[in-house]
Amino acid sequence: NTLYLNFLRHYLTKIHPKETAYRVKKTTKSAHTRLCPVKKSIKSHPHRSTFRTHCRSQFSTVQSPNPAMSSQINVKIAQDFLAFNQASASEFHCTAEAVSLLKSAGFEQLCEKNKWDIKPNGKYYVVRDQASIIAFAVGGQYTPESPMIGTFAHVDSPCLKLKPISKQSSADMLQVGIQTYGGLLTHTWFDRDLSVAGRVFVNRGGKITSELLCIKDPILRIPNLAIHLDRTVSTDGFKPNTETSTVPILASALADLGFEQLGKTDDADVFKYPADGAKAASSCGKAACGASPAEKLAATFSVKHHSAFLQRIAFELKCEAKEIVDFELNIYDTQPPALNGLYKEFIVGRGLDNQLMSFICTRSMIDAVQSGLESQKSLMLVGLFNHEEIGSMSTTGADGNFLASVLGRINPTALPQSSARSLWVSADMAHALHPNYTAKHEVNHRPMMQKGLVVKVNANQRYASCLSSNAPLMLCAAEHDIPLQDFVVRNDVGCGSTIGAMMSAKTGIKTVDVGVPQWSMHSVRETAGVLDVQSSHKLLTQLYKQYADYEEQFDCSL
């Protein structure tokens, strides 16, 4: 207590020199200590909010009493990710959060439609269709023949997406039709507080703009069937039909009739259905004579979805329902991410696969170029792609031409020479050993939580890792005493894949597949380790800084 209160006194004196009469005082009747101000208490101190913020940053470590966890768990990088994850309710929001990080670090936006003027010491990023981003920094000593070092991840996660015609109803309940996206663990989406997030096309005075939408309130739910009505579910397993059993409930059917009492509240920030809700929303289904093409689109669109739902979207975007032209929306879990475990050593949240690697890759490059860029020889890149969970074959996916297009514009003269000296790091989450299912892992390749980044290897090239691509990463880890783990799948289990193999084949650049180990992959809520986030961020940051030196140490020619 005395040590802590001395810190308070030192801090308060520092931020407010005139208020120097804070002192540690021991009471006469007990051994307790307290901070005794002469003029003002801490509660009334003018810098109270600053004080709280400072304390959070100063005490953002959790000292583990467990001897097995001898080092301090610095949760700062994990807390930064929690904020990133909370704001990334869809792939579009995740891309926008990456843009925010890059802008804050001084990166300049480029547009594919325009000419580029790339200069040494420059930091740039380019976004494609709001769902994929490539950022790069040009070293001050860079030449067209210099090596490239890049880390790549994906922003999408398995989820439920709204159908083009979502309007459904059953048993006097309004429902929204959904499609399953990727290989999600369907049963984990039941009995969750769900909402929608994505992007909406809005007609703003004749110009159609794409606007991000995230309804933070839980407005959807997929209820489980009571065990009394399905007695064999515990013995035969829960096998939901993804077409009929996973249809979320939006509201009672009364809402679509403009029932005046629904949504009524004294809170000005909470959505209220208008008294003429049905008329207000349905009126946009009739295009007036002489309507513009956008207005006609909106009129056609409005009949495909519940009017009450469109009213809620309009409320969030501060527009009218008749101005909504189209949307692309995911269903997401509204429960915030959190630190979990006795020592706050676990991160739990939605979409860790692969928002966590997207965050680590982006932060690692940003931190690597904050100083010393002028002496760098390398071209450093980070790429976040869409549609990995469904094969990556799209304009915003890693199997598209986005990366090749960017590389060609950066280096139109000597790309083959540079590629031969370069390294890609494909970063996608890995499977941590589950204590309840240890037999699922190969006996000698069991990545553990809190034991470091995982290098994935597959003899059939489902992963791109090979001897020449692994070596620089392993050398960097050894130099900085950063742990690495190895993973191969059991021979009697099918092996997954990610973007590494396709990127390596398309660009001819050696690639290593890595990932932070996690539990519950493709669940609505996943788990990873704080220490793995720390060590992975440190490793990739150092690899960015030192790859040009490592590259010169290897000769793979015959």
Regions found by a protein language model. Give the residues of each.
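Short hydrophobic alpha-helical segments enriched in small aliphatic residues
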Residues: 2, 17, 31-33
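Polybasic, lysine-rich low-complexity intrinsically disordered segments
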Residues: 6, 15, 26-30, 40
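N-terminal hydrophobic/helix-forming segments and targeting peptides
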Residues: 34, 45-558
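Acidic, Ala/Val/Gly-enriched low-complexity intrinsically disordered segments
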Residues: 19-24, 31, 38, 62, ...
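Aromatic (phenylalanine/tyrosine) cluster motif
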Residues: 4-7, 11, 22, 51, ...
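Short intrinsically disordered, low-complexity coil segments enriched in acidic
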Residues: 1-4, 414-415
